[in-house]
Amino acid sequence: MAINVKREGTSHEARFKSEALKRGLDVLVPEGDYLPYDCMVVNGEGTKIRVQVKGTSYRAKGSKAHRLLAGCGKTKAALDPDLVDVLAAYVVPADVFYHIPVRRLEGARSIYLSPSFGDSRAKYEVWKDAWSVYENGGFHE
């Protein structure tokens, strides 16, 4: 069966929402898909954090890292930190989310994630499973 990108994205978003709810976070989903974020996470203090959810299974031949296209829209423009707070990047084979503050992407349209290596010092590893970005009064870098 051919991969349906929209279906796959919906699956990643559902996984994110389920995990967020398990952690006591509320998730608001806008009607339609015209906004630059997929959902808003509301923490226990009522702070709203705008989240774009992306997922990847892709790993380049010979590479240990998974490549994720972090851009959005038809042009895959870089996420705008004035419009989106956090990129929730799901690496399917490792079943793990990275919660990366969009400002930390520094305009990158694609990123590499290395969840299979526990001792990795790759740029975004500090954000692996970092659900804490949604807690304690809201989004903190």
PLM region spans:
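Mixed-charge (Asp/Glu-Lys/Arg
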Residues: M1-L35, M40-E141
